[in-house]
Amino acid sequence: MGQDRINREERRDMDFQKNQLLTTEIIDISTEGEGIGKVNGYPFFIKDTIIGDQVEIRAIKLKKNYGYGRLEKVITPSPFRVTPSCCFHRQCGGCQIQAMSYEQQLAFKHNKVRNNLLRIGGFGPEELDRIMEPVVGMEEPFRYRNKAQYPIGMDKEGNPVAGFYAGRTHSIIANTECLLGVDENRTILEAILQYMKEYSISAYEEASGKGLVRHVLIRKGFTSGEIMVCLVINPEHMKGRTGIREKNSKREWLPHQKELIERLVAIRGMTSISVSINCEKTNVIMGTEIHTLWGKERITDTIFVRDVDNCFARTGDGIAFSISPLSFYQVNPVQTEKLYSLALSYAGLSGKESVWDLYCGIGTISLFLSGRASKVYGVEVVPQAIEDAKQNAANNGITNAEFFAGKAEEVLPGFYGRKDAVSHSAGSTEQGREGMFHPDVIVVDPPRKGCDEMCLDTMLKMAPDRIVYVSCDSATLARDLRILCDGGYELKRVRPVDMFPQTVHVESVVLMQYCGK
């Protein structure tokens, strides 16, 4: 009897049956955007729900310690529930919390960062209440994305469609009117789809690997107004056409290419039209070979410094960036200005400091820092991004930023490990050597997995006065902050930034001060 009771407690799913109807209240949101509700202590994950909803669900999957439910109906809506602006929000799944008021979205994201710092980082609630600042939100939390990638397919009637993949599937939800993208996206897509229909241009079919048009990439410079369109194509479908894979071939890459170009050029702001060659059976969108069909190879955009103490008003200081179809560039330029201006403010630069910028991408933060630092060293693993960073520095007349290609966890320890040899090398000044091996500030902006352990260890050995951590994942942020604090640093300021309204994602900027071991 006792063993039966123990087994039953261990397997709480035994209290439920698949397809059983249950009621619950949503008490939290998961990292994937699913609502979390408990029934007799057993948690269910339920899509399309928000905190505060009283819902009826159907149990669709039962695991040992948690299950998944499908929303059947909202019994009592949350006071934070609003009518979503997009009619595709449930099918698409890209905007997991669009049914939540924007004010509550910001509160949710603040709590998400705080809870991870509490639970994973082990920081005290009183400390966090003292150092955490309000989430930086958007005045207009729609139409903020400067980049969109639309898969192209065929509907049941054989007509070309563009849209987005339904959650966790490869089924395209036809939608040319995503409310996160710019207004021009719809006009561009409709022109391409009409061209495909009129000239019987095939869409790529993943199962067979046949078909020509795979994706459409659209980028827009918010300050310049310049628009780039890149069609990702599968030219193996056009076997027999000589020269189809010749670099810079003057042959047409698309049937009736001239007609498509004429339609796209008529759209205001059109600056660049190109194709990306991707013949692989892969879910990677872009190919590595780009051919410009019309206009420039790149578009430009300018990121301005903002005054964080004056409601984030623009200061007039800006950095211009050159953007190719393959460039990494933050997709929300309005919030990017606020995010990087916070990082610049937290760095506390006076013009005399040396700074390392780790995971620097195309140099966005590095070039922001260069205007107020003596020297900036940027590190990025993607060689093309480093080439872009160097070119962006040259385009802006910046001479005090130096960039290195490689993994931060290899480049930084490599430099530090060779400090004695470099210190005695000809041509290196004492001030330059000191700044490189003992910087005043280190800025890190790692991917979701956070900083590598070797990188963190070297940062602690370098012992900069300040570390500014820009994070896109508050769980790995909390883990890394604990390591740095155990190594002699103290949290000074934490501020979340809403880079992706209508989604569960949140970025953060953190200032740490060295206080000794």
Residue ranges and their predicted role:
Residues 2-88, 410:
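Terminal RNA-binding accessory module
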Residues 2-23, 31, 237-517:
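Rossmann-like S-adenosyl-L-methionine
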Residues 35-40, 163-166, 230-232, 389:
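Short, acidic/hydrophobic/Gly-rich beta-strand patch recurrent on exposed beta strands
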Residues 37, 52, 95, 216, ...:
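Residue-level signal for inorganic ion chemistry
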Residues 52, 181, 332:
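Short, conserved phosphate/pyrophosphate- and ester-handling motifs at nucleotide-, phospho-/glycolipid
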Residues 72-83, 90-205, 223:
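Extended interfacial segments that mediate partner engagement and assembly in macromolecular machines
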Residues 172-214, 235-274:
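Internal alpha/beta scaffold segment
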Residues 219-221:
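Structural signature of eukaryotic scaffold interfaces centered on beta-propeller domains
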